[in-house]
A protein has these predicted regions:
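Conserved helix-loop functional segments at active or binding sites
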Residues: 52, 225, 262-266, 351
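Flexible, glycine/charged-enriched surface loops at secondary-structure junctions
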Residues: 56-64, 162-165, 228-235, 265-276, ...
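Active-site-proximal loop/turn and secondary-structure-junction residues that shape catalytic pockets
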Residues: 69, 123, 235-238, 340, ...
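Gly-rich Lys/Arg/Thr-decorated short loops/hinges at beta-loop-alpha junctions or inter-strand turns
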Residues: 22-34, 107-113, 187-206, 283-305, ...
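C-terminal accessory/binding modules appended to enzymatic or scaffolding proteins
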Residues: 197, 209-210, 214, 218, ...
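Active-site loops and adjacent core secondary-structure elements that bind or stabilize anionic groups
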Residues: 1-197, 212-230
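Glycine- and Gly-Pro-enriched alpha-helical subdomains that act as flexible
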Residues: 71-110, 240-340
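C-terminal binding/interaction regions
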Residues: 115, 119-120, 133-163, 168-170, ...
Length: 390
């Protein structure tokens, strides 16, 4: 198959639409459904991310994409009991690749509603069973077990999008893109991200444990496929907050940091103790938790309202309790796709438990950024490599 006709492009008025190869066969097979234009943008970007993440870490990897940026990405380390609870995966059998996807989707479950999933490894029944429970547009993987494919084909009334990609496919070294009838040409960003990038530690504190190195690689590879400007917070093998497509660096850091704070707060005892009414849908639980953690908590706790969601009216999680809980957190890594121009990014990041930073460096104020890290004992590595993605 050299081309695949699509229903329309980004919007219904954008016709005709297709994906095609000028030379050779498309490296994919559509095993189920009818993926659209944006689905394929998500699929091909997310596949590159998980493929490179597995190559860099040696672990199964997964991503959850929305509108051509990752809402989350992760490697397949086992889940704790608390993580199983906040990801609605209690009592489920979870293979390493299933753990990777559960973590990737769990980074920001609200943003992952209707996501495109990407798996570095063959999709097995464990992963398919979890996907079947979630609202998702489709999945790309290098293969599917018979049982997994049968499960996925029952999703969305049989219309769930399932794409298989040739894991050995390698694109051309030069890529093209048309904008306003004008063709842009550039070398593909084939820069390999690995531990050698982390050797230039510029702070007084140079203690970088293996777990932090892994998390730095996850941050950098996630950023490589996130619309710029972008910042990514990572902890324990998974993204916990991705700030994408912002026009100032500090807004990226704040956006991603606020998402990371929400991830941390979902593990607060008051959140873990929320008692939901029987039969509540997973998206409704996600929405309720998100509102409960926000300043608009009365929208779900008001008299006559809370009964729709909770069996018992929850106690308010106060601003003081939130601040105290987040202040106790540590071991978080943050990555940036371009240099931090000011120390304010470090000041914001450390409020979310950040102890490790990886970024290109190259600002005229690098000395100030380094000094801010030194003030808090943060370890920072300069990679010398910008990772813009558009």
């Amino acid at each position: 198959m050299t081309e695949l006709e699509l229903k329309y492009g980004c919007n219904p008025n954008q016709k005709p639409a297709r994906i095609f190869m000028e030379e050779g066969e498309l490296p994919i097979q559509v095993l189920n459904g009818k993926p659209g234009y944006i689905n394929f943008l998500d699929a091909f970007n997310s596949w590159q991310l998980v493929k490179e993440l597995k190559e860099a870490t040696g672990l199964p990897a997964a991503a959850s994409f929305k509108h051509v940026s990752p809402a989350g990405a992760a490697v397949g380390t086992p889940l704790t009991d608390v993580e199983r609870k906040i990801y609605f995966a209690e009592g489920m059998e979870l293979s390493p690749i299933a753990c990777a996807y559960v973590r990737a989707r769990g980074a920001d479950r609200l943003c992952s509603y209707g996501d495109w999933a990407a798996l570095s490894d063959v999709c097995d029944a464990d992963t398919a069973r979890y996907l079947a429970l979630e609202v998702s547009d489709g999945v790309i993987a290098p293969g599917y077990t018979d049982e997994a494919l049968a499960i996925l084909k029952t999703k969305r009334k049989g219309g769930y999008n399932v794409v298989q990609i040739d894991p050995d496919y390698a694109p051309k070294a030069v890529e093209h893109k048309d904008v306003f009838g004008i063709t842009f040409e550039q070398g593909r960003n084939s820069f390999a991200i690995n531990e050698a990038l982390l050797d230039n530690i510029v702070t007084d504190n140079k203690e970088l444990p293996e777990s932090a190195k892994r998390d730095m690689l996850i941050a950098l590879i996630t950023l490589k496929y996130t619309q710029s400007n972008s910042v990514c917070y990572v902890k324990d093998g998974q993204a916990i907050g991705v700030g994408a497509g912002q026009q100032s660096r500090i807004h990226c850091t704040r956006l991603a940091g606020n998402k990371a704070d929400n991830w941390l707060l979902r593990q607060h005892p008051k959140v873990l103790g929320l008692s939901f009414v029987d039969g509540i849908r997973r998206p409704d639980r996600d929405n309720a938790i998100d509102v409960y953690l926000s300043d608009e908590y009365e929208d779900v706790l008001a008299d006559g309202v809370w009964q729709n969601t909770f069996e018992i009216r929850p106690e308010v999680l106060t601003a003081e309790e939130k601040k105290e809980w987040i202040a106790r957190q540590s071991g978080v890594t943050v990555g940036s796709d371009a240099f931090f121009p000011f120390g304010d990014n470090v000041e914001r990041a450390r409020k979310s438990g950040v102890q490790y930073i990886v970024q290109p460096g190259g600002s005229i104020r690098d000395d100030h950024v380094i000094a801010t890290c030194n003030k808090y004992g943060i370890v920072m590595a300069f990679t010398g490599m910008r990772l813009f993605h558009h």
